[in-house]
């Protein structure tokens, strides 16, 4: 067969953006999920690739965790509006991306909705 059909595609660098949420009302009512559990979850997300060094994910790492905290268990703002405050842009558009430093990640923390705060972990 054709040798090119057997070669793996190599992407020199990729940046994944993930979003998620925790429902405090469901956690309180059904699971007993606590603030301590939440902190363990944040630590797990930050370190989830430390012991997962397969050939296809050799250098994966969590680079930044942006946490939006609400004063109310029912939330103080829609999650999609908060996610829109996180911006990722190329430092040198048009130049090949080779590392995390080729991106600029910013969080707009001005005029936050009442009852919302931001924590950033790196």
Stretches with model-predicted labels:
Residues 1-4:
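Short, small-residue-biased leader/transition segments that mark boundaries at the very start
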Residues 7-13:
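Short glycine/proline-enriched loop/turn "hinge" motifs that connect secondary-structure elements
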Residues 20-26:
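Beta-strand elements of well-folded, non-transmembrane domains
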Residues 29-32, 78-79:
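Short conserved micro-motifs at the rims of enzyme active sites and ligand-binding pockets
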Residues 33-52:
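Long, well-ordered alpha-helical scaffolding segments within enzyme catalytic domains
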Residues 50-81:
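Short, conserved secondary-structure transition motifs
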Residues 74-122:
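C-terminal accessory extensions/subdomains outside the catalytic/core fold
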